[in-house]
Regions:
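Transmembrane beta-barrel domains of Gram-negative outer membranes and organellar outer membranes
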Residues: 1-109, 115-203
Length: 203
């Protein structure tokens, strides 16, 4: 985070994911496997610390159409968002609750791609465990409400998963984590199961 003024900071986040995707056809008992580069993203956020417990932030995330095949959305996206942080010092030094929402919108340009228009929500709860270990519930904005074009198998607008992450701080700047998610409500199908290994580096 870059200090701007008293209580104000500018943060940036870049991500270039490698994606392994498996699509299973239970009728033919076959599975298709894809591996490659996913959609790269860049995010800029302005945050304001109100006091020791409360902080708020607004920002925008840009998602580039860099994925091959079906490993990405097939669209450039812009995702403005906001969030509020409340520190839970009673549970631990780095325990906090951060409800956040961003609105994903596709940028016109690809007439063949599906139009994207969906709120993406994350009621993130981070809890410190003994030592360098931590657990986070809903670390990703994976609760989604689809107002864009429908997808195959869609019966409603809501996708609501159970999403959790366990990680370890390797140093003050580096953390390694494993995230797993399974759908609870899949009226708007996004995935059947998601697992991500993340290496986070702070500068």
């Amino acid at each position: 985070m870059i200090p701007l003024d008293v209580g104000w900071r500018l943060g940036a986040h870049a991500q270039v994911p490698l994606v392994q995707k498996t699509t299973t056809n239970f009728e033919t008992e076959s599975a298709d496997h894809e591996f490659g580069l996913g959609d790269a993203s860049f995010q800029a956020v302005v945050a304001h610390a109100i006091n020791d417990r409360w902080a708020a932030a607004v920002g925008t995330r840009l998602v580039a159409q860099t994925a091959a095949g079906s490993l990405g959305s097939g669209e450039w996206q812009v995702q403005p968002g906001l969030g509020v942080r409340y520190m839970l010092f009673e549970l631990g030094e780095d325990c906090y609750f951060v409800p956040s929402m961003r609105y994903a919108m596709s940028i016109p340009g690809n007439a063949q791609a599906r139009r994207i228009s969906e709120p993406q929500i994350a009621p993130t709860l981070n809890i410190d465990l003994p030592g360098p270990v931590f657990i986070t519930f809903y670390p990703s904005n994976d609760i989604r409400i689809n107002y864009g074009a429908p997808v195959a198998g869609q019966t409603g607008r809501l996708f609501f998963p159970f999403d959790a992450l366990i990680g370890v701080r390797l140093s003050d700047q580096v953390a390694l984590s494993l995230e797993g998610s399974v759908p609870i409500v899949k009226a708007y199908p996004v995935y059947n199961f998601k697992a991500e290994v993340k290496l986070r580096m702070l500068f």
